[in-house]
């Protein structure tokens, strides 16, 4: 969705109109500022498939790179073909013309190693990156992120990163302030590799989330020593940590917002952990009711020639 995280999608019926004598006779007469405000509330598909087709003025504004500074591609439910997903994502990256600041991609259903690199090579000013997926390789993520020296926020869900890649990422992104890592069931195996890499290379972190990570007390102590500016630390489902004594006191006194391993995931809706230990990806109502076999989108196989 091409919008801030706090702005909900805007349905066609909700499009704002001017009142009284200022109301235009048709959509083509909307002031550019108001039109830009409308498009910023729409998803990439809503712009590409609908909004830009309203009239020439809408198409012209939809090509403005400022419309594409924040791209959210999490919900490409209508693009049932993985090649169409890649094509659409690459197209919106092109439309940003190097001005992309935020990129949010749901990789759960298709491979994005090449897409991530495509985006990174054209978006060196990127500040925030969120990737969700279980197939993309550590090398693929590493090769993309090291091309983003201005990155401030990084969120990786169900992505495996090797220790040496993690360290290089920390060195390549000195402005990193927020890091969120969500694993599968890695907390079942003790491993401080992630924690030690973070402590060694990311001293400027303010917000750190390690959900379902295998770190132990050793890794936690290293993070507390190596990241002295931490304000928020989320260790939910990190069950290899034993909080007691000085370690517990240090966490509670130093960290303004501290989440313990046993704290509930009531504010976390990316994944559902079932009783039998399997992982169930949450689906919205739109996806449940949508048929991926239908061919009602121009992105089914190719991009429209007039855009």
From Swiss-Prot:
Q: What InterPro entries does this protein's entry cite?
A: F-box-like_dom_sf (IPR036047), F-box_dom (IPR001810), LRR_dom_sf (IPR032675), LRR_FXL15/At3g58940/PEG3-like (IPR055411)
Kindly indicate whether the keyword Signal belongs to this entry.
no
Biased region (Acidic residues) positions are 279-289
SUPFAM superfamilies (alphabetical): F-box domain, RNI-like
Annotated region Disordered: the residues are 1-26, 279-307
Q: Keyword set for this entry?
A: Leucine-rich repeat, Repeat
Polar residues bias: where?
Answer: 1-15
LRR repeat locations: 108-133, 158-183, 185-210, 212-237, 244-270
Coiled coil regions, renumbered to chain: none
The keyword Repeat is assigned to this record: yes
Q: Which residues form the F-box domain?
A: 24-71
What is this protein identified as?
Answer: Putative F-box/LRR-repeat protein 22
Q: Which organism is it from?
A: Arabidopsis thaliana (Mouse-ear cress)
Organism taxonomic ancestry? Eukaryota, Viridiplantae, Streptophyta, Embryophyta, Tracheophyta
**Gene from which the chain derives:** FBL22
């Amino acid at each position: 969705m091409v919008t801030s995280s706090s702005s909900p999608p805007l349905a066609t019926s909700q499009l704002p109109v001017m009142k009284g004598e200022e109301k235009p006779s048709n959509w083509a007469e909307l002031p550019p500022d108001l039109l830009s405000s409308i498009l910023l509330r729409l998803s990439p598909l809503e712009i590409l498939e609908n909004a830009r087709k309203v009239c020439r003025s809408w198409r012209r504004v939809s090509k403005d790179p400022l419309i594409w500074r924040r791209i959210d591609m999490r919900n490409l439910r209508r693009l049932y073909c993985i090649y169409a997903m890649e094509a659409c994502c690459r197209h919106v990256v092109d439309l940003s013309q190097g001005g992309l600041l935020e990129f949010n991609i749901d990789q759960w259903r298709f491979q994005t190693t090449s897409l991530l690199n495509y985006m990174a090579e054209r978006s060196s000013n990127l500040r925030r990156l969120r990737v969700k997926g279980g197939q993309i390789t550590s090398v693929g993520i590493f090769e993309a992120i090291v091309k983003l020296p201005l990155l401030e926020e990084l969120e990786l869900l169900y992505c495996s990163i090797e220790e040496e890649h993690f360290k290089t990422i920390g060195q390549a992104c000195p402005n990193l302030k927020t890091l969120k890592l969500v694993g599968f069931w890695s907390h079942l195996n003790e491993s401080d590799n992630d924690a030690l890499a973070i402590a060694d290379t990311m001293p400027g972190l303010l917000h750190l989330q390690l959900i379902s990570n295998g770190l132990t007390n050793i890794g936690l102590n290293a993070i507390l020593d190596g990241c002295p500016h931490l304000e928020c630390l989320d260790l939910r489902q990190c069950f290899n940590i034993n909080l007691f004594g000085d370690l517990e006191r240090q966490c509670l006194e130093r960290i303004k917002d501290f989440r313990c391993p046993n704290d509930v995931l009531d504010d976390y809706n990316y994944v559902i952990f079932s009783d039998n230990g399997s992982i169930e990806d949450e689906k919205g109502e739109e996806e449940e009711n949508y048929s991926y076999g239908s061919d009602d989108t121009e992105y089914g196989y190719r991009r429209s020639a007039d855009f």
